Amino acid sequence: MRDNQNDDGSYFNYYPITGRPPYGYTNDQPGWMGWMDAGIIVPWQVWQSFGDIRVLEEHWDSMVRYMDYLERQANPDGSQVSSGIGDHLAIERTDIGLTNTAYYAYDAHMMSKMAAALGKTREARKYAALYDKVKAAFVAKYINEDGVTVAPYVAFRWPGMPVNPNAPKDGDIIPVDTQTSYALPLYFGLLDGELRDKAVAHLVADIEEHGNTLTTGFIGTPYLNPALSEGGRDDVAYTLFEQTKYPSWLYPVLQGATTMWERWNSYTIENGFGPVDMNSFNHYAYGAIAEWMFSHQLGIQRDEDRPAYKHILLQPKVGGTEDFAKGGFETPYGRVESGWEKTADGFVYRVSIPANTTASLTLQAAGPDKVKVLSGAEGVGPFRALKGRVLCELQSGSYEFEVRN
């Protein structure tokens, strides 16, 4: 990405770039927000996952050039322009300015954290202030007092297309009210307090209105279930996760899928193959649900302030129709494993924490009297109760807990 970064600081949508128009692309044109932001998100994810600060050092100047590009094209209030394709292949259309502004805020948040890690105090303050500015602009422009997402109407007409006299006028504020329009600001931390609660409620209402199916595209899908779980609606997240109707994660599986497809219906038993254009059968975007499976179903999460899983946040969410869930992965300190199994009166939770790390555990339990340590008690800190949850600190080691309803 650095080698092919455009002179204006923008990135293209994918690399390497091959061919020439109309069948290929040149790298002298900016890509789309949601794609270009990989220039910020990838270094962030590498650093957070592995703790290697060198990737930030090597990529810093490139990231600054990209942020400068975004700042030049932003509106005076801090919101972003409506350019690009937005939530690609979504069932419901979400205003592109809304999604671009949400990503701009997220970029600023990551830049502030990475600047602080590099000892760039002034830059850390600059990007933190930018995040606050864009966050305020997002709420002012795209959220009404009832917590519903809105946006200025922009007419789209092909040349020669007749004007609909009943259509809104350009600039009229109209509802957006899509799943993506709530998932992004919720996940990116743009909504606080009552507005956050209202947005979660509107998100759930939209899901229910669509028969408990998702309507998100490439931009919204990765954040949909995490936003629900962080908003206290694990029940809805599990309903979506297990849904088999179109569109859903399991719908393609029932049509014979063994890979992630570009479209939910790239192939159906009833109708066969879809259009040959944009119909990839090996297209990871919707596979982002795997992140929720690890971070919420199994509950293995990173601590942003202590990268590389030096400190692990464990918040397993037991739910759905599954009898058990278990899994893990290698961290720089060793393998972390987490799993739960339902019982007649609750569940049993097992976890292994690598050497030279610690963890904060949050269990779904009515109170400390409902939690029993079956093994590893010597490494378990005191229990604390908080709103239907029990919290404790863990040292490295293996543990087993019994939680009763």
Where are these predicted regions, by residue range?
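Substrate-binding groove/exosite segments of carbohydrate-active enzymes
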Residues: 1-71, 85-86, 219-221
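A structural signal for well-ordered alpha-helical segments within the folded catalytic domains
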Residues: 37, 41-44, 102, 109, ...
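Non-catalytic C-terminal accessory modules of carbohydrate-active enzymes
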Residues: 235-405
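Short Gly/Pro-enriched turn/cap motifs at secondary-structure boundaries
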Residues: 30, 173-177, 281-284
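Catalytic cores of carbohydrate-active enzymes
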Residues: 10-17, 71-273, 393-395
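Short alpha-helical "patches" and their helix-cap loops
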Residues: 1-2, 55-61, 119, 195-208, ...
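Acidic/polar, glycine-enriched structural segments that form the non-catalytic walls/loops
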Residues: 48, 53-55, 67-69, 115-117, ...
